[in-house]
Amino acid sequence: GNAIAQVWREDPERILRYALDDVTETERLARHLSGSTFYLAQMVPMPYGQAARTGPAAKIEALFVRGYLHARHSLPKAEWGSQVMGGYTDVFITGVVGPIVYADVESLYPSIMLNYDVKPASDALGLFPRLLRTLTALRFTTKDAMRGADGHTRGELDARQTSYKNLINSFYGNLGFGMALFNDFAEADRVASVGQDLLRSIIRHIRQAGGRVVEVDTDGVLFVPPPGVEGDAAERAFVDGLSDLMPPGIRVGFDGRFRRMLSYKKKNYALLDYDGHLKFKGSSLVSRSIERFGRRFVREATALLLEEDIAGLHALFLGYRRAIQQHDWAEGVESFQRIETLKNTLDAYERDVNENKRPRAAAYELARQRGVETGRTIRVGERVAYYLASAERGARGFEAARVAEAWDPAAPDESTPYYLDRLDQFAARFEPFFATPHDFRQVFSEEDLFGFDPRGIRLRVDERPPEELEDDVPF
């Protein structure tokens, strides 16, 4: 920090060790994150830095432009309009269900574009399908080579196939992008429509076999396998059977099996695998923006709910309440602090407040206070960690906020009522999974006058049949 000049004069070796640590960390991060960009820079007409900064749409367009300029052919103008169709997403069962199989159509949109002769109307040279077919062949060849490769070579090949995959997956988006030179909204809609019909066909086959579809999400289906389909081998065989029912070039892959699933809402669920690992999708249950104790509580409560351990849920809730009341934080202030990143300058923030465009916010007020105390300029992108302390009745949130480093475990001053209320808010996320509001309140309440009895408390599973599926599909 500010003492670096003094440390350099007094202990230069310490600074050199610090710098070497930075270089080592950067190299290791680059090894994990930069491989695909390195190989992309060999394919697209961009230097490495530009390839790292630009999005996939710009890379695809650069390939098209290079091909057309090389052929001395004029470039088309972007088509005006918008895409109408989208991916098929829906949820048919909410609650705790299992076992679960996840089947997905491998490379759904690229497979459709290759097998249904999709290309933009403005692509006079037919470059779209040729590039897509070439990249797909390169990716499959690279993935095949990975199977027998050693660790270092395998990592290099994986970076290559990832770079191919990133480009391949961008072709569909390019069709529906309003500013792309080679866009074609009608073709983008056709791809999405075929994708929807393929997924409806998969759903229909699963239901006809006796399975229960939980959720469909653009290119995959989560479902309870039919009676008699038990175990890894049988589940894989069932998915292979689904693949055999698809048109040529469309393959359904087995993408995982799970012991239980907590289905919350569309694109928001938790999966418990057979090794006890918990996987979350979406942010409705667990969000990175909430306090650390809240994330931990939701994860632990979800694991217990998946096991249908009602007594354990009640004990967990009471344990967190006691810890908050007793200022017993496992990781100190990091357990309950909030961390926010400043997205505007302090001047812009103050102007918006004065113009009633936004209320005062704790992070900005504390950042301004820090700037006054240190005499330095507070910049956009700085992070502010804070908590809410006990305050007089009627105090606004930003007035009760304190910087996290001010919290003293020997004299804790965080607002216990506020953090108890936060715990109740986290617990409220589980109310939809109980049969009645009374059942929910029994579990997430400290009122144990006659002792807690989990018997009679029922979980709720709501199921609706998938929409009536058309018999006609485009294959």
Feature annotation, model-predicted:
Residues 22, 26, 139, 168, ...:
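A residue-level signal for conserved active-site and pocket-lining positions in enzyme catalytic cores
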